[in-house]
Amino acid sequence: MQHAPARELLHFIKNSPTCYHVTENIRQKLLANGYTELSERERWEVAPGGKYFVCRNGSSTVAFRVPEMIDGGFAMAAAHSDSPAFRLKEHPDRRSAHYVQLSTEKYGGMLMSTWFDRPLSVAGRVFVRANGEIVEKLVSVDRDLLVIPNVAIHMNRTANDGMKYLANIDTLPLLGGKDSGGILPIVAKAADVAENDILGSDLFLYCRGEGTLLGENEEYILSPKLDDLECACGCLEGFLAAKESGNIAVCCIFDNEEVGSSTKQGAGSTFLRDTLRRIALCLGKDEQELQMMLACSFLVSADNAHAQHPNHGEYADPDNCPYMNEGVVIKFNANQRYATDGRSCAVFRAVCENAGVPTQVMSNRSDLPGGSTLGSISDTLVPVSTVDIGLPQLAMHSSWETAGVQDYEFLIRAMTEYFGSAL
């Protein structure tokens, strides 16, 4: 078992408190690996042998590599950059009872109780005046700043019997005392801008501290945002490491999966379709040739899966549940919440066999509907053969999640094989 890839993942997550930081860190990694950044506002020059990427909204990325000789379609993978969190409202300061709290709302379906009684801070992006223009700046308040305090057991004797949390009351973070100047001066200082120059912002709470490896043999990863930065980073590492094949390799990291993907930068947008069409046009393909390429293309939708829980095995289908450190998970759902079918499963299994990577399967217990993910959503706009996969983890949508060290290495190996193979 190699621990180095997992430690690199933890370092990436620590430096990526929001989807905007995720995208910037991916951008820097692509540039360092010789990829050329394209802009949707400009004409593209794409040539065989070239390596390129394009970002949308500062929170989604599509990277692609064109082989010298194209004799196939697109070999694509998709993961997502966002995670459940609390987003600050436009007027965030709330003053009451000699305290200043921050007014927030939930982003995505989180386990709210896991955000209590731990050091938090604020990160995201601000839009500021600069020389007559509006400029975007990333910001992260790099210190322990906030806490969401629990109510003491002495005041709520039934707390351990189950608690219903109200997002407008129970989960408001504490910033300071009655003389606090509020959050804006702190954000402005962290961004190195004047308060009056901030015209807009997208700010979120995030958990402080770096994740860790634990377990008897350090076989588990404990960290925020494993859903879905574990798959996002694993797909990207495989994409960068793969040898050239006859397919155009495409790695997508979309935003807004946790809220349904129906945004201009989500998997339900035209971002991927637009990018593939522009690639084809730059390579001299017409619409019919593009459709022929799509007909022989493939998409791996990578989003983490629920591992069998050590305390609550009753929530899983006993014959179709995955375990941590036992392989990449292929996900199935009869109602198409996952896009896997017999053919796409077979293709991905063959890829994993060639890479020496074990696979597992997951279907939800038949009376528990479970969630959906990128594959079926993306398929409506880019209809290609698709497999939904993930890595097994515990406590999905908790502020800290647990996954297997070995599985992350398995994913990198599988995606390296996938991007380098002729499907």
Where are these regions (language model features)?
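N-terminal hydrophobic/helix-forming segments and targeting peptides
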Residues: 1-423
